[in-house]
């Protein structure tokens, strides 16, 4: 596989984190994993040169119900519009600022399926942005750096367990689906990649907790992850009865379950009312 940054006449732009998927076997496996069906309301983030876009459109799109796509690179937008016409509705702009709820069906029922080969340089901020629309989403399938996927699905007590793990596991059921090697891309990235499936919990399954407070607690806990929680959460000891919660501060952040972090955030909410 060539290391050239040019593919199909387009130069991959480093500032957009562009690595184009070119392995047709991998593309078929990804589309099978996603399982698109006619008439579904699907959004692709960063369609690039259309490697996933084409088979997705073939399986689900009609002029009345097109595939939606959010793309920042204006050079690619013109090519995609010309290639797919009314079967693809393009939204020019940054996915980090895009209102995905604007594409949801009317009503309270989740209706969006979101997919994409996410730019690795903005993957974590984008995942947190998407979290704010989770109630409108049926599922998400993303290509990400394998290290990020491992952190997303990591269990407590492992080195990979992190702030990202806690915040996403609170909101989604997640599963690593496929490994994707560097040679599947043009130009090949310097890291391994993987596909992750993310299914939001339904409202009745979610704990009653303010995600902002949960984020505050988790960020503090992981701010110095090699230190004991008695140090990183020390500022909360005057307001939260950790002993009453059965919360052992003689641990590190990676050793605490999502449910325990939720409990601390709930206790914090109670004293701040």
UniProtKB/Swiss-Prot annotation:
- What is the first-listed, main subcellular location in coarse terms? cytoplasm
Q: Does the keyword Methyltransferase apply?
A: yes
Q: List the disulfide bonds.
A: none
What Enzyme Commission number does this protein have?
2.1.1.182
Give compartment(s).
Answer: Cytoplasm
Is RNA-binding set as a keyword in this record? yes
Domain of life, per the record?
Bacteria
- Return the InterPro entries for the record: KsgA/Erm, rRNA_Ade_diMease-like_C, rRNA_Ade_methylase_Trfase_N, rRNA_adenine_dimethylase, SAM-dependent_MTases_sf
GO terms, molecular function: 16S rRNA (adenine(1518)-N(6)/adenine(1519)-N(6))-dimethyltransferase activity; RNA binding
Give the UniProt entry's GO cellular component terms: cytosol
Where S-adenosyl-L-methionine binds, per the record, is at 19, 21, 46, 71, 94, 117
The entry's keywords: Cytoplasm, Methyltransferase, RNA-binding, rRNA processing, S-adenosyl-L-methionine, Transferase
- What catalytic activity is recorded? adenosine(1518)/adenosine(1519) in 16S rRNA + 4 S-adenosyl-L-methionine = N(6)-dimethyladenosine(1518)/N(6)-dimethyladenosine(1519) in 16S rRNA + 4 S-adenosyl-L-homocysteine + 4 H(+)
Q: In which family does this protein belong, per the annotation?
A: Belongs to the class I-like SAM-binding methyltransferase superfamily. rRNA adenine N(6)-methyltransferase family. RsmA subfamily.
Under PANTHER family, the record lists: DIMETHYLADENOSINE TRANSFERASE (PTHR11727), DIMETHYLADENOSINE TRANSFERASE-RELATED (PTHR11727:SF7)
- Protein's job: Specifically dimethylates two adjacent adenosines (A1518 and A1519) in the loop of a conserved hairpin near the 3'-end of 16S rRNA in the 30S particle. May play a critical role in biogenesis of 30S subunits.
**NCBIfam families attached here?**
ksgA (TIGR00755)
Q: What is this protein called?
A: Ribosomal RNA small subunit methyltransferase A
- Which species is this UniProt entry from? Burkholderia ambifaria (strain MC40-6)
Its ancestry begins with: Bacteria, Pseudomonadati, Pseudomonadota, Betaproteobacteria, Burkholderiales
